[in-house]
Amino acid sequence: MKKILIIGGGAMGSAFTFPCIDNKNEVTITEPYNKTFIKNLSSKKKYHSSLKINLPNKLKYKKYSTHLLNNKYDLVVVAL
């Protein structure tokens, strides 16, 4: 299992979470600009308003900060 960080919760970054989680990876997503996105992810449904779908339940989210990059990830995807 790889640890993957996705920076950017838009359509591309969010869509990328599905195959990553399907392949048994630990995925964390963060959004540096859109606070509404993070609010929606904190709900139980993890609803993405642009894609009009619920994101995977195993998806983790964290509030963006530069300290987040100090954690060890196998892959960092920038989808901005």
Region spans (language model):
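NAD(P)+-binding Rossmann beta1-loop-alpha1 motif at the extreme N-terminus of oxidoreductases
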Residues: 1-70
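N-terminal Rossmann-like NAD(P) cofactor-binding module of classical short-chain dehydrogenase/reductase
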Residues: 75-78
